[in-house]
Amino acid sequence: MATPASAPDTRALVADFVGYKLRQKGYVCGAGPGEGPAADPLHQAMRAAGDEFETRFRRTFSDLAAQLHVTPGSAQQRFTQVSDELFQGGPNWGRLVAFFVFGAALCAESVNKEMEPLVGQVQEWMVAYLETQLADWIHSSGGWAEFTALYGDGALEEARRLREGNWASVRTVLTGAVALGALVTVGAFFASK
């Protein structure tokens, strides 16, 4: 279970991430959480992980919030159903990022459907879910410090560079093999003439 000291941290993390995502979509103007660069390394890490998640799973995850047909009367039930389904196989950091992205998408859909009061409620549900359903797992997995170590301080960019570097090496080898094969074929052709 979460300690009382973690509650403001969780609330601030949720508010920062949701505000950041709403601003990305052009829904929020003015000062508030999520505006500008995040000073807190945890907030920076969650923003980067959320952006990476959306980039990788845009097709799969896009329009999920719209497909739920959320109304003020059904929003909490839908939120809980999707969250429970998301963690059905057990929590991990990737699913936790998906949870944040889903919550922010639900907030954006609420603004889009002119149900702005739901934004604050969804954030409260996110905080409550984190503190009641996921706090023990987060704590036993190294806490938010472990998340920040895994996803913060450019770790995602470095992993992407390594992945792209590995694929670039594979592409180079394959291209070289194809070119060598073509040269051998051309050489054999001219040798037979």
UniProtKB/Swiss-Prot annotation:
Motif BH1 per record, residues: 85-104
Entry's Gene Ontology molecular function annotations: channel activity; disordered domain specific binding; identical protein binding
Q: Which domain of life is it from?
A: Eukaryota
Pfam families assigned to the protein according to its UniProt record, in alphabetical order: Bcl-2, BH4
Report keywords, A-Z.
Answer: Acetylation, Apoptosis, Membrane, Methylation, Mitochondrion, Phosphoprotein
**Chain positions of motif BH4:** 9-29
Which InterPro entries does the UniProt record give? Answer: Apop_reg_BclW (IPR013280), Bcl-2-like_sf (IPR036834), Bcl-2_BH1-3 (IPR046371), Bcl-2_fam (IPR026298), Bcl2-like (IPR002475), Bcl2_BH1_motif_CS (IPR020717), Bcl2_BH2_motif_CS (IPR020726), Bcl2_BH4 (IPR003093)
* Subcellular location(s) per record: Mitochondrion membrane
Q: Where is this motif: BH2?
A: 136-151
Task: Provide the tissue specificity.
Answer: Expressed (at protein level) in a wide range of tissues with highest levels in brain, spinal cord, testis, pancreas, heart, spleen and mammary glands. Moderate levels found in thymus, ovary and small intestine. Not detected in salivary gland, muscle or liver. Also expressed in cell lines of myeloid, fibroblast and epithelial origin. Not detected in most lymphoid cell lines.
Entry similarity comment: Belongs to the Bcl-2 family.
User: How does the annotation summarize its subunit structure?
Assistant: Interacts with HIF3A (via C-terminus domain). Interacts with BOP.
What is the protein name stated in its UniProt record? Bcl-2-like protein 2
Q: Which gene encodes it?
A: BCL2L2
